[in-house]
């Protein structure tokens, strides 16, 4: 009986691999991109690209686990949720008050060690803010 359950789970695992999430990959360079709107110091621009842009822009640099389900589904849901809260690729579309509020939220989240997410720091060592 244990073998049957194992084989069933193995087949199920293989089948779910056929259902890959949509990827957040855009090569478009938008005028509304934060770095196109403001001249940022290189250190800040580098910090944003290594710690924030994978979840908060229109272009995610995915690790290999995106191809393994259900990890890929989980990761894509986090990217979608992250872009809903803040999208640097569309930063210029925010109203001035909203943009200021988002920048304040970034500062607070980083000070309280809530961002980047722990799971992201685990596979992206460049994102550790120490």
Regions found by a protein language model. Name each.
Residues 73-122:
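Extracytoplasmic electron-transfer domains, predominantly the class I c-type cytochrome c fold
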Residues 19-20, 40, 49, 76-80, ...:
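Short, compositionally biased low-complexity segments
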Residues 126-130:
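Short, exposed beta-strand-loop hairpins at the edges of beta-sheets
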Residues 62-76:
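Acidic helix-start/capping segments at beta-turn-to-alpha-helix junctions
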Residues 1-38:
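Post-cleavage N-terminal segment of exported redox proteins
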Residues 37-45, 61:
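Start-of-domain marker
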Residues 48-59:
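The canonical Cys-X-X-Cys-His
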